[in-house]
Amino acid sequence: MEKKTAYCLLFLVLLVPYTALGAVLKRAPAKKEKRAVPLAVPLVYWGASVSPAVWNWLLVTFGAAAVAAAAVTVSDNDSHSCANNRGWCRSRCFSHEYIDSWHSDVCGSYDCCRPRY
C-alpha cells in the first residue's frame, strides 16, 4: 500500500503545479508584437557600383533607405569593378585574366575577370 501512496503523491506533486501554472498563464497579459528588424546590406556591397539587376534585387530585399545608407550606386551597364576592385566585369576576359566565378554574381550578365598573378 505504501507504494501506491508514494505514486499518488508523486503524481499529485507533478500535476498540481502544472494546473496552477496553466491558470496563471491564461491570466497573463499578451505580449506586444515586436517590430521586424530591417536587414542590413551585406558588406560586399557597401560603397560598390553594381549592375541594374543587382541594384533591383538590393532594393527589393533591403529597401531603398538601407541601400542609400550603404552608399551603393547603380551603373548604367554591367561593366564595372568587382572582387573589391581586384577585377572588372566584362563580357569576355582577356588572355591574361581568368573568370572569378565567386565574385561574378555582382556583374549581372557579365563575368568577373581578374588578372593572373
Swiss-Prot record:
GO terms for biological process: defense response to fungus; defense response to Gram-negative bacterium; defense response to Gram-positive bacterium; killing of cells of another organism. The keyword Zinc does not apply. Residues 24-33 form a propeptide. Coiled coil: none annotated. It comes from the Eukaryota. It is found in: Secreted. Residues 1-23 form the signal peptide. GO terms for cellular component: extracellular region. Disulfide bonds join 82-112, 89-107, 93-113. Keywords: Antibiotic, Antimicrobial, Cleavage on pair of basic residues, Defensin, Disulfide bond, Fungicide, Secreted, Signal. Pfam families: Defensin_big. The keyword Oxidoreductase does not apply. Significantly inhibits the growth of Gram-negative and Gram-positive bacteria and fungi in vitro. Belongs to the big defensin family. This is Big defensin. It comes from Branchiostoma belcheri (Amphioxus).
